[in-house]
């Protein structure tokens, strides 16, 4: 064999080994990444953090990440609550979300947590992001993302949803309100999003004309005055979009459902904040809700003028979300199973 042929074969083998190594490394990552294609979001990085026991954020956030990356150009990294024993996604694990340090390079954080209590080393990265002036989108249970019941002496215990000193913790102080109650009858009364006519021309509502989801309306009774309500939540009498609104006090007045505000952290820099109390995996079957969250991602990252009413928010691959409920998550799923 000539030297030139041997070199070509050796180079090919080496390249193959490098690709295999990279593939194995990626498969072992406890998160999933979607590289942005061409689009307005190209060059910007969104970190989406899932971790709730009931509303299947571990299904919704990979779907959103795929849309934001493939349809709109953002690089998206999705983090999960992970069982450290086998590397599978375990929404019941409240203390382990690998990859939080990736927030250091993020341009936007999308959050769908519930009652987490992360180690201080991880919360340090979260805290730095919250105070950096960078934007945040909170979905559904993000208003009660944290519950410090084990380590109440942690410097980050103030993030707890029921904190008394930093009243209402992260939910109230950053997003605008903390968890109060189910305003609609959970599992029996669904939600119709009613656009606030005062804000009908807000960029986030571009192309949004219908929002409905099977989750109930949350009680939002102490929303900070600085919040700007874009959509109110109308309680429907049943679990179908055709059901009529409930009569009486539940809809008089309607609760805030989707709002924006600003938060100034310890850095002195101000963040754009978006929060909605919708956001279960089944809620995102609503094209209107998907569009509102995609538009919010543009708005949060300073791409307001790039928002289009005709941009695609179609699913990248078949989306059959699991209906909400405790203990209903799919066992044995690893982050790599969400890779494209």
Q: Which residue stretches match the model-derived regions?
A:
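Bacterial N-terminal signal peptides that target proteins for export
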Residues: 1-13
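Bacterial N-terminal signal peptides
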Residues: 10-22
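Sec/Tat signal peptide C-region and signal peptidase I cleavage site
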Residues: 23-27
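Extracellular ligand-binding/catalytic regions of CAZymes and related secreted enzymes
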Residues: 28-41, 59-60, 67-71, 237-340
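Helical hinge/lid and interdomain linker segments adjacent to catalytic or ligand-binding clefts
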Residues: 29-35, 47-49, 53-146
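Catalytic beta-strand/loop cores that center a nucleophilic Ser/Cys/Thr
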Residues: 31, 69, 75, 94, ...
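Nucleotide donor/acceptor-binding cores
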Residues: 44
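A glycine-rich, often tryptophan-bearing local segment used as a flexible ligand/cofactor-contacting loop or short
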Residues: 111, 115-207
């Amino acid at each position: 064999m000539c030297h030139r042929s041997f070199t070509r074969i050796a180079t090919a083998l080496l390249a193959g080994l490098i690709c295999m190594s990279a593939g194995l490394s990626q498969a072992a990552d406890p998160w999933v990444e979607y590289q942005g294609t061409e689009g307005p979001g190209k060059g910007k990085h969104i970190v989406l953090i899932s971790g709730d026991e009931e509303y299947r954020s571990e299904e919704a956030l990979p779907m959103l990440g795929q849309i934001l990356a493939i349809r709109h150009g953002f690089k998206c990294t999705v983090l999960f609550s992970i069982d450290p024993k086998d590397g599978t996604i375990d929404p019941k694990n409240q203390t382990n979300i690998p990859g939080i340090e990736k927030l250091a390079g993020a341009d936007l954080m999308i959050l769908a947590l519930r009652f987490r209590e992360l180690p201080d080393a991880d919360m340090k990265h979260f805290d730095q992001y919250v105070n950096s002036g960078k934007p945040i989108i909170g979905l559904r249970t993000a208003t009660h993302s944290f519950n410090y019941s084990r380590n109440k002496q942690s410097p980050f215990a103030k993030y707890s949803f029921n904190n008394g000193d930093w009243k209402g913790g992260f939910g109230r102080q950053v997003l605008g309100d903390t968890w109060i109650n189910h305003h609609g009858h959970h599992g029996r009364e669904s939600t119709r999003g009613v656009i606030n006519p005062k804000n009908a021309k807000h960029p986030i509502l571009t192309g949004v004309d219908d929002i409905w989801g099977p989750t109930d309306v949350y009680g939002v009774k102490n929303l900070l005055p600085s919040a700007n309500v874009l959509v109110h939540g109308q309680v429907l009498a049943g679990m179908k979009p055709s059901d009529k609104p409930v009569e009486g006090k539940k809809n008089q007045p309607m609760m805030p459902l989707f709002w924006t505000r600003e938060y100034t952290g310890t850095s002195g820099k101000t963040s754009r904040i978006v929060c909605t109390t919708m956001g279960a995996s089944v809620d995102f079957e609503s094209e209107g809700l998907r569009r509102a969250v995609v538009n919010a991602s543009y708005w949060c990252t300073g791409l307001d003028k790039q928002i289009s009413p005709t941009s695609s928010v179609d699913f990248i691959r078949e989306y059959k979300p699991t209906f909400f409920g405790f203990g209903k998550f799919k066992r044995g799923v690893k982050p790599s199973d969400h890779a494209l």
